[in-house]
């Protein structure tokens, strides 16, 4: 999810 880090969350 995007809430993880922003870039790694998208993956």
UniProtKB/Swiss-Prot annotation:
Would you tell me the protein name for this molecule? Answer: Tachykinin-related peptide 7
- Protein task: Myoactive peptide. Increases the amplitude and frequency of spontaneous contractions and tonus of hindgut muscle.
Query: Where are the bilayer-spanning segments?
Result: none
Which locations, inside or outside the cell, does it occupy? Answer: Secreted
Q: Which GO terms describe its cellular component?
A: extracellular region
Q: Does the keyword Secreted apply?
A: yes
* This protein's UniProt keywords: Amidation, Neuropeptide, Secreted
Q: Which residues, renumbered to this chain, carry the PTM Arginine amide?
A: 11
* One GO BP annotation of this record: neuropeptide signaling pathway
Q: Which domain of life is it from?
A: Eukaryota
């Amino acid at each position: 999810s995007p809430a993880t880090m922003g870039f790694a969350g998208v993956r």
